[in-house]
Amino acid sequence: MSEIIHRSKTRPVRVGNITIGGNNEVVIQSMTTTKTHDVDATVAQIHRLEEAGCQIVRVACPDERAADAIAEIKKRINIPLVVDIHFDYRLALKAIENGADKIRINPGNIGKREKVEAVVKAAKERGVPIRIGVNAGSLEKRILDKYGYPTADGMVESALHHIRILEDLDFQDIIVSLKASDVRLAIEAYEKAARAFDYPLHLGITESGTLFAGTVKSAAGLGAILSKGIGNTVRVSLSADPVEEVKVARELLKAFGLAANAATLISCPTCGRIEIDLISIANEIEEYIAQIKAPIKVAVLGCAVNGPGEAREADIGIAGARGEGLLFRHGKIVRKVPEETMVEELKKEIDKLAEEYASKGKQK
């Protein structure tokens, strides 16, 4: 399968210790659901997100209590912190002063140009990038008056208008998002944006829904955009524990070969030929490999029909039979294992393979 081609002219923008854009990998983001002023709860959730693979985290900043909490939160986390600003530009100024690694502003509600200018000046002084967050649900009145309703052209026009304001102030540390809850609108907007400017694009389908429906909707929209080589960072928006957002984002990137050092599971859908408890085995292995930092493909297969063929495509795998399983490695049978020890034996082989990849990496 051919590799996805990324836009080579995307500008790199530094966010804390991570660079978005350029030739860098697509970065996974999420957003906390805690009250930001509750520092302990917010930090605890961010630590869970970090553990799940979140690389950049965003917090809401609806009031001064939240802005005042930024400094303490920053001290206690290890990943870059983005502060989300709506309506009151003064909160952006305070967040920047307190150590935010990036600011997200919505052009539709931040206010007059001079307020944006004040935020840009503060960000420039501290080397803090700004994400221009265009949202189909909150476009400026002049855009809606011109187009009649949210359109991809209107969203891109809004983004370009605010990009020019920042550029006029000699500010180029810009990241742009063009989010919509309508999947087709979002796809069109991101496609047009990718042709209109070379700033990094933050991908997202906003208000996508619950864990199940939102995952499907996000995968459809974000997958279509990523498949075109568009996008430098991604946030899957779900009405769920934000850790689930990170899990979905990781799987989505893995599906397109965009997640380095991540293990992938393939498992069969099961049928009447299955003689082992494949579903529980697959779930356990999926959870186990979530923390494996090696590009390993693991197969959990239920019978001899597709098992051997699929196993050849995997680095390591198991093909089940009645009461036992065949352990495969790089398409070759390693040994038979009884069903009761099948999972533990597979885990051992996964660990061995991960160690081999790690040692190869150290030797380079």
Swiss-Prot record:
<keyword id="KW-0560">Oxidoreductase</keyword>
<keyword id="KW-0479">Metal-binding</keyword>
<feature type="binding site">
    <location>
        <position position="303"/>
    </location>
    <ligand>
        <name>[4Fe-4S] cluster</name>
    </ligand>
</feature>
<dbReference type="InterPro" id="IPR045854">
    <property type="entry name" value="NO2/SO3_Rdtase_4Fe4S_sf"/>
</dbReference>
<comment type="pathway">
    <text>Isoprenoid biosynthesis; isopentenyl diphosphate biosynthesis via DXP pathway; isopentenyl diphosphate from 1-deoxy-D-xylulose 5-phosphate: step 5/6.</text>
</comment>
<dbReference type="InterPro" id="IPR011005">
    <property type="entry name" value="Dihydropteroate_synth-like_sf"/>
</dbReference>
<keyword id="KW-0414">Isoprene biosynthesis</keyword>
<feature type="binding site">
    <location>
        <position position="271"/>
    </location>
    <ligand>
        <name>[4Fe-4S] cluster</name>
    </ligand>
</feature>
<keyword id="KW-0408">Iron</keyword>
<feature type="binding site">
    <location>
        <position position="268"/>
    </location>
    <ligand>
        <name>[4Fe-4S] cluster</name>
    </ligand>
</feature>
<dbReference type="GO" id="GO:0051539">
    <property type="term" value="F:4 iron, 4 sulfur cluster binding"/>
</dbReference>
<dbReference type="Pfam" id="PF04551">
    <property type="entry name" value="GcpE"/>
</dbReference>
<keyword id="KW-0411">Iron-sulfur</keyword>
<protein>
    <recommendedName>
        <fullName>4-hydroxy-3-methylbut-2-en-1-yl diphosphate synthase (flavodoxin)</fullName>
        <ecNumber>1.17.7.3</ecNumber>
    </recommendedName>
</protein>
<keyword id="KW-0004">4Fe-4S</keyword>
<dbReference type="GO" id="GO:0141197">
    <property type="term" value="F:4-hydroxy-3-methylbut-2-enyl-diphosphate synthase activity (flavodoxin)"/>
</dbReference>
<dbReference type="InterPro" id="IPR016425">
    <property type="entry name" value="IspG_bac"/>
</dbReference>
<dbReference type="InterPro" id="IPR004588">
    <property type="entry name" value="IspG_bac-typ"/>
</dbReference>
<dbReference type="GO" id="GO:0046429">
    <property type="term" value="F:4-hydroxy-3-methylbut-2-en-1-yl diphosphate synthase activity (ferredoxin)"/>
</dbReference>
<dbReference type="GO" id="GO:0019288">
    <property type="term" value="P:isopentenyl diphosphate biosynthetic process, methylerythritol 4-phosphate pathway"/>
</dbReference>
<dbReference type="GO" id="GO:0005506">
    <property type="term" value="F:iron ion binding"/>
</dbReference>
<comment type="function">
    <text>Converts 2C-methyl-D-erythritol 2,4-cyclodiphosphate (ME-2,4cPP) into 1-hydroxy-2-methyl-2-(E)-butenyl 4-diphosphate.</text>
</comment>
<feature type="binding site">
    <location>
        <position position="310"/>
    </location>
    <ligand>
        <name>[4Fe-4S] cluster</name>
    </ligand>
</feature>
<dbReference type="GO" id="GO:0016114">
    <property type="term" value="P:terpenoid biosynthetic process"/>
</dbReference>
<comment type="similarity">
    <text>Belongs to the IspG family.</text>
</comment>
